[in-house]
Design a protein with these regions (language model features):
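A general structural signal for well-ordered alpha-helical segments in protein cores
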Residues: 5, 38, 91, 176-180
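Short hydrophobic/aromatic beta-strand or adjacent loop that forms the aromatic wall/cage
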Residues: 21, 107-111, 131-133
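A short alpha-helix-loop-beta-strand transition element characteristic
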Residues: 1-6, 101-104
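Active-site lid/adjacent beta-loop-alpha segment flanking the redox-cofactor pocket in flavoenzymes
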Residues: 100, 116-204
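Central helical "cap/lid" subdomain
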Residues: 77-125
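Structural motif
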Residues: 67, 77, 82, 111, ...
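Helical element adjacent to the flavin cofactor pocket in flavoenzyme catalytic cores
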Residues: 24-82, 90
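Short loop/edge segments at beta-strand edges and connector loops
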Residues: 4, 54-56, 197
């Protein structure tokens, strides 16, 4: 639902609103811990008879007359009527082993978490600011400021390493600094807040 700049300011009292023409509030939205959600899905799948096999490398996809029939792994071939490519950063490389093109490239993703600020609390709604390429939410008493810059820095163009899951990458301050400063201008007091965490990692 569309709300006024004043209503947005009441939801986030620390926000700069003099350049806001309108905002959109989605009261039914929420966020979850992705690891907890994955575990819940896995538990539900097992309860319904699924078998989950971990630590397996998929090396190919089998097909018959243009239709997928299973996957080839380092532990043998598994027949399947449906194969879902949920390989994240590796989805393009897996797709290349089939006739399916997955236009995806891992890129650097940045976020920082500030030290505790007195106006942050868990009931604050998540804010997305497309003009500043930023998103914001409360995190542990501070504020998480994340970036989705218009042209992200690509990572590992020659192929994604197979032994990387949660990599931490060096921060390219020259490239990301202006975006970060602009994003934090939405909440000017954050410029004076300490930084608890600054993170850059690959994301699909």
């Amino acid at each position: 639902q569309e709300i006024s700049a004043a209503e947005f300011g009441r939801m986030w009292p620390a926000a700069k609103t003099d350049d806001v023409l309108a905002a959109f509030h989605v009261p039914d939205e929420g966020r979850v811990n992705p690891a907890d959600l994955a575990m819940a899905y896995a538990k539900g799948a097992r309860m319904r008879g699924a078998r989950i096999v971990e630590g397996v490398t998929v090396t190919g996809v089998t097909s018959d007359r243009g239709r997928v029939t299973g996957v080839v792994t380092d532990r043998g071939t598994i027949a399947a009527e449906v194969v879902v490519n949920a390989a994240g950063m590796w989805a393009r490389e897996l797709g290349e082993r089939t006739v399916v093109s997955v236009p995806l490239q891992a890129a650097e993703h940045y976020y920082l978490i500030t030290d505790t600020v007195d106006w942050a609390h868990p009931d604050l709604p998540v804010v997305e600011d497309p003009d500043r390429y930023g998103y914001y939410r409360e995190e542990g008493g501070g504020v998480l400021v994340g970036l989705f810059e218009p042209v992200a820095g690509p990572w590992s163009l020659d192929g994604i390493p197979t032994d990387v899951a949660f990599a931490s990458l060096p921060t390219d301050w020259d490239r990301i600094g202006p975006y970060l400063s602009a994003a934090m201008d939405r909440f000017p007091s954050l410029h004076d807040a300490g930084v608890r965490t600054m993170f850059c990692g690959p994301e699909s």
